[in-house]
Design a protein with these regions (language model features):
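Negatively charged sequence features
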Residues: 1-44
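MIDAS-like acidic motif and immediate structural context at the N-terminus
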Residues: 11, 34-63, 67
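DG-centered beta-turn motif at the end of beta-strands
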Residues: 48-53, 128-141, 165-167
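An active-site-proximal "capping" alpha-helix that borders the catalytic cofactor pocket
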Residues: 62-82
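Charged helix-capping and loop-helix junction motifs
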Residues: 64-66, 144-150
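Short glycine-enriched loops at secondary-structure junctions
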Residues: 83-88, 167-168
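Von Willebrand factor
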Residues: 88, 97-132, 139-140, 144, ...
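Von Willebrand factor type A / integrin I
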Residues: 149-217
């Protein structure tokens, strides 16, 4: 089951294989140590809804790495969706980190509401679904619709996390008003460093407190 995964070891071993000089990922074997059998009933679904507008470049790189690592884990169903004003489902590219990275096309506007609507079809068991919205929340589409969909997701039992950025340092740009409204719905909103992603995933899947991450905003 997902709770049997050693997320810190598995993810940390692979995050380092992005080579900034080559501007590509040089992966090693993916590691997964599962101590229990997995059935459809106890399998988690993790949905990564990734903003590929121009301001999200560094976050896209780290999102692609984490997506491939998660997709390699048999105890998790992973869906990878990229969006600007259009939507691209990159799930089928997740077995090749380089192929996945080049599936992203940076630039364009942002329609977060549209992407969330697309992702809703992948929620089969809300209590076993973790939805990451990786975006600076600079919505160019229907902001009220975005908030309504997130609220409905939360009420159904989905664990929703808004990652404003995945970056090594610095204060990220994000739409503070939308972030505040999401926080009012009980959605944690924060930026995260790549090094803390393993801990974040572990705590989120175990339903643990994420308040220390929110202080990083």
């Amino acid at each position: 089951s997902a709770s049997a995964m050693d997320f810190k070891m598995t993810i940390s071993r692979n995050l380092k294989h992005y080579n900034p000089d080559l501007k590509t990922i040089v992966p090693e074997h993916f590691y997964f140590f599962d101590r229990t059998s997995t059935t459809a009933a106890n399998k988690w679904t993790i949905i990564l809804d990734i903003d590929q507008s121009g301001s999200m470049g560094e976050s896209v790189i780290y999102s692609s790495i984490i997506s491939c690592i998660l997709a390699s884990m048999a105890s998790i169903k992973t869906r990878i969706v990229a969006f600007d004003t259009n939507i691209v489902d990159l799930t089928e590219k997740s077995d090749d980190p380089v192929d996945l990275l080049f599936g992203f096309q940076l630039g364009g506007g942002t329609d977060i509401n549209k992407s969330i609507a697309y992702c809703e079809q992948f929620i089969e068991n809300p209590a076993k679904t973790l939805f990451f919205l990786i975006s600076d929340l600079d919505e160019g589409g229907n902001r009220a619709g975005l908030l309504r969909r997130i609220s409905d997701m939360k009420e159904s039992g989905v664990t929703v996390i808004s990652l404003l950025a995945i970056a090594d340092g610095g204060k990220p740009y994000y739409d503070a008003q939308t972030a505040q409204k999401l926080a009012g719905l009980g959605v944690p909103c924060f930026a995260c460093t790549p090094q803390l992603l393993p801990t974040l995933l572990e705590k989120a899947l175990k339903g643990q407190d994420l308040s220390k991450f929110e202080k990083m905003k």
